[in-house]
Amino acid sequence: MYVRVNVVDFKSKEAMDEALSIYRLNSAKWMVGAQFLLTMKTSDQSAMYVAVYNSEDDADNALVGREKYIEVMGDLVHDVFYHEGDMDFAYLNENFINADSIQIGS
């Protein structure tokens, strides 16, 4: 598995809320090939985006979708950077899938 983590600093809390809303609505179709997508608010103006793919090639193919998202939220953003690499470890508790914030897709 291959993981890409984006960290985004927004111009305001409202900008972050708008960008996260756009991501929730579009990420599954934009990040083609993603096996797992997660966002985390790291402050009132920043968020971390995690995307897990089967391979580095799948992650690279999804860069088109990442660019679409960056283009859409461009005026909302102060700074963006990302890290990526092979997944070393993952654990998923069976109760996790029942959490209210989880959206199951196909």
Residue ranges and their predicted role:
Residues 1-48, 54-68, 75-106:
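Short S/T/G/P-rich N-terminal loop/turn motif that feeds into the first structured element of a domain
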